[in-house]
Amino acid sequence: IPAFDLILECSAEPSVLAGYDGLPDYVVNTNLMGTGNCLEAARLHGANMVFLSTSRVYPIETINKLNCEEGETRFELSIEQTVSGIGPRGLDETFPLEGGRSLYGTTKLCSEFLLQEYIAMYGMKGVINRCGGLTGPWQMGKVDQGVVVHWAAQHVFGGELAYIGYGGMGKQVRDVLHVEDLYDLINFQLEQLDKHNGKVYNVGGGREVSLSLLE
């Protein structure tokens, strides 16, 4: 491998449904072992890493039990909650991590821990971005990943759509981040990597760029 000074680690099997077919080793080998290989390459070359993690590191059941209020087109988070790390703007980085989160989310969280160990042990510099819903050109949307492009394509080409879960009304909400905005963020972090070294950030579009499936 030619010399390099940075790895942008965004490779993964990104489906939350991956592994439910009885093949968990594929997800573990692709996501966790893949990150391990990238970290070793970075260590041997004296390189740093920007790791694109996921909002799926947060446990599914805990999220599903959050107090919500039902509006005409979407669910809104209630002010009163029984867990920390949640507010009107959504989840922050202090949200509890105990519980199940899918093999995808678990392997990405374990990859975060690996990066933090490499930072501590080998003096590598790195930053972790827990991305929410990303979208933009060349996203190949499908049922289990790339929801914005998938839904847009189904509307354009007259495909079938169904609301799954949460009462089947399509009121569940996700915020969306364009890939160009993610690019700007990464550039900003790299310009002052010492400041962001070892930090974990939730990365999304925020309430201003959020929508429900129904909307």
Task: Report each predicted region and the residues it spans.
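N-terminal Rossmann-like NAD(P)+-binding domain of SDR-like oxidoreductases, especially those catalyzing
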Residues: 1-132
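Protein kinase-like catalytic domain
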Residues: 43, 119, 156, 190-194
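Catalytic tyrosine of NAD(P)H-dependent dehydrogenase/reductases that use a Tyr as the general acid/base
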Residues: 104, 171-174
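Conserved mid-core alpha-helix of short-chain dehydrogenase/reductase
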Residues: 37-41, 176, 181-184
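Glycine/proline-rich active-site loop of Rossmann-fold NAD(P)-dependent oxidoreductases
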Residues: 109, 122, 135-150, 163-167, ...
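PAPS/PAP-binding and catalytic site of the sulfotransferase fold
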Residues: 210-215
